[in-house]
């Protein structure tokens, strides 16, 4: 039975963080589109560095810390509300706020196909990492696994965005995914042991790119 539960958890995690899960993440680049337009990301190597830095030291790291906290607090409605408010406040731009809130709303709507009391405990609208953390925690998925899948999904989407923006090819994209595996693993483990005191980022260029994207005239992405 234990093995069956582990397989069930794997199937659910795979479904929830699959590109096919209907949350619309393909519409967002998290400022990457502006970074490409500004010449900050021009090839596959720079794309890999950009993504890796965000995962380890940027907004994605903060998302991982918030996910871990909501995973721990999934049974406490009051604590979930507090961390949800914090996650929303940490969104560094209008588009970043829109992105994380709409993804969170879409994730919860789709994840209700797997009924659980956690949906009653969560606020109606929450940031994406809060939604993922609370739902995976409620379904007994280990935090390291939830975090690794969440980070891998982000990297995959960012790579896809880079390909669509013309700074990398498909083989480059696969190589980036392979090359960032160890980094994803390390960050997932670090985030699983984190507390809210570990929140913080050092990716000023990425934050500025996210802000500048708001006034970009020609765009493929919503952020």
Curated annotation (Swiss-Prot):
Any one Pfam family match given in the protein's UniProt record, by short name: UreF
Record GO terms (molecular function): nickel cation binding
Keywords, sorted A to Z: Chaperone, Cytoplasm, Nickel insertion
GO cellular component: cytoplasm
Compartments in which it is found: Cytoplasm
Family statement drawn from the similarity comment of this UniProt entry: Belongs to the UreF family.
Function field: Required for maturation of urease via the functional incorporation of the urease nickel metallocenter.
Record's subunit section: UreD, UreF and UreG form a complex that acts as a GTP-hydrolysis-dependent molecular chaperone, activating the urease apoprotein by helping to assemble the nickel containing metallocenter of UreC. The UreE protein probably delivers the nickel.
Protein name: Urease accessory protein UreF
């Amino acid at each position: 039975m234990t093995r069956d539960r582990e397989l069930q958890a794997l199937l659910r995690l795979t479904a929830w963080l699959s590109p096919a899960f209907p949350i619309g993440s393909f519409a967002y680049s998290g400022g990457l589109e502006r970074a490409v337009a500004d010449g900050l990301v021009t090839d596959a190597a720079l794309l890999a560095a950009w993504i890796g830095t965000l995962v380890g030291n940027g907004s994605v790291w903060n998302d991982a810390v918030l996910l871990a906290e909501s995973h721990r607090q999934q049974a406490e409605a009051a604590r979930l509300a507090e961390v949800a408010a914090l996650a929303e406040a940490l969104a560094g731009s209008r588009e970043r706020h829109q992105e994380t809130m709409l993804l969170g709303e879409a994730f919860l709507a789709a994840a209700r196909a797997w009924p659980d009391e956690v949906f009653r405990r969560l606020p109606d609208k929450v940031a994406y990492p809060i939604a993922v953390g609370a739902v995976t925690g409620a379904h007994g998925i280990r935090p390291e696994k939830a975090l690794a899948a969440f980070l891998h999904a982000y990297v995959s989407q960012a790579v896809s965005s880079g390909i669509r923006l013309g700074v990398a090819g498909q083989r480059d994209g696969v190589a980036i995914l392979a090359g960032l595996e160890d980094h994803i693993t390390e960050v997932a483990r670090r985030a699983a042991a984190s507390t809210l005191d570990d929140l913080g980022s050092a990716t000023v260029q990425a934050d500025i790119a996210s802000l500048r994207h708001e006034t970009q005239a020609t765009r493929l992405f919503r952020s």
